[in-house]
């Protein structure tokens, strides 16, 4: 027999309250068990290790100071998510190559990510995709990733990790979707086609200027893929370098109008065919030795690209247009610099703590 209850009565109301309270307590107990189990596990995953290192090397206060004047104060409507929490979510997106929706799912699924962001799912949910989209639009509107990139580099320079005596310049291709099967029935008009070797690419280029001593990126620009590397060189110099190292694709740079008057020594790789055609003698041996030395210095420019493409999984453009993608590149290379300087920064952090 089903017992019907008038929930307006004191007895049934108290029973309902007891039931609801018991269920909440049970849920909280279940969550605490999972958190205890997570905290008690012995093995530290690579993700936990990386997030722990980034917790220490990211100059949080400096970056937050740069963003605070632009972040909504929440005087009307729903209170905004805290700025530091939003920045942490945004960094997770860059580190792991996630979409806006993917970040929300990853934080919900991963206790390590929730700990890094500071979210307790028993009290709140992860920031949704729309919230992250609005934050990205804020960064784009005020060109704030360029500011964050500069702030990170200023911190690295202040700690003696960026010498600015020499620059290595290089570029990498970033493919864009070539298909016209979209709402506009057209490809991105700001992206272009170029040929490298025997293969054609459609997309853009990321050009970087790298400190020849540390291998850290000091300048970032973005162009369409068909723009020649040599034409962007002048924009990759900070003005304080005395030596510039370039591969053979930059041959003739010293003759270009935009670099006239710059007090630098150009170290451009000799083309392989020219070196190969030389007579085998002592002079060629000297040239070979010199080219190997230049190549060993230029090799440092590959390290930022390695972190970008293999660690951050950024191998193709994420958005339409050069501006939005260049905005992201500034943030990505700022974070790349922190990864490259990680060991030295952690050592300095340990010295400061002792």
Describe each region flagged by the PLM.
Residues 76-83, 198, 320-329:
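Structural motif
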Residues 18, 26-37, 83, 92, ...:
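Polybasic low-complexity intrinsically disordered regions
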Residues 1-15:
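Single conserved hydrophobic/aromatic residue that forms the stacking wall/gate
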Residues 3, 196-200, 295-296:
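Short Gly/Pro-enriched turn/cap motifs at secondary-structure boundaries
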Residues 51-65, 70-76, 85-101:
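A positively charged, amphipathic N-terminal helix/segment that binds anionic biomolecules
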Residues 32-37, 242-243, 248-323, 327:
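Helix-centered, glycine/charged polyanion-binding patches within enzymatic domains
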Residues 14-61, 68, 347-354:
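Charged, often Cys/His-bearing segments associated with DNA-binding zinc-finger transcription factors
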């Amino acid at each position: 027999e089903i017992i019907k209850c008038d929930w307006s009565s004191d007895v049934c109301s108290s029973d309902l309250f007891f039931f609801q309270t018991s269920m909440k307590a049970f849920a909280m107990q279940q969550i605490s068990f999972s958190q205890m189990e997570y905290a008690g596990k012995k093995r530290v995953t690579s993700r936990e290790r990386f997030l722990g290192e980034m917790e220490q090397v990211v100059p949080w206060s400096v970056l937050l100071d740069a963003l605070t004047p632009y972040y909504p104060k929440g005087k009307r409507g729903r209170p905004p998510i805290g700025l530091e929490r939003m920045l942490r979510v945004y960094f997770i997106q860059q580190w792991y190559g996630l979409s806006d929706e993917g970040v929300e799912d990853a934080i919900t699924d991963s206790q390590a990510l929730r700990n890094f962001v500071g979210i307790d799912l028993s009290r709140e949910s992860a920031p949704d995709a729309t919230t992250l989209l609005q934050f990205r639009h804020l960064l784009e509107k005020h060109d704030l990733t360029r500011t964050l990139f500069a702030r990170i580099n200023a911190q690295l320079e202040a700690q003696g990790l960026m010498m600015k005596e020499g620059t290595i310049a290089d570029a990498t291709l970033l493919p864009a979707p070539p298909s016209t099967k979209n709402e506009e029935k057209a490809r991105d008009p700001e992206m272009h086609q170029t040929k490298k070797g025997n293969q054609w690419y459609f997309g853009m280029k990321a050009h970087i200027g790298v400190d020849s001593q540390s291998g850290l990126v000091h300048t970032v620009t973005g162009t369409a893929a068909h723009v020649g590397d040599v034409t962007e060189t002048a924009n990759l110099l900070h003005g304080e370098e005395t030596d510039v190292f370039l591969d053979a694709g930059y041959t003739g740079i010293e003759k270009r109008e935009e670099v006239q008057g710059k007090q630098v020594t150009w170290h451009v790789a000799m083309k392989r065919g020219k070196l190969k055609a030389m007579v085998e003698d002592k002079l060629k041996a000297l040239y070979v030795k010199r080219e190997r030395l230049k190549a060993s210095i230029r090799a440092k420019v590959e390290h930022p690209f390695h972190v970008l493409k293999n660690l951050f999984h950024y191998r193709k453009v994420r958005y339409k247009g050069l501006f939005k993608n260049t905005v992201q590149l500034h943030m990505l290379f700022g974070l790349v610099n922190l990864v490259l300087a990680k060991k030295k920064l952690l050592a300095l952090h340990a010295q400061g703590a002792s």
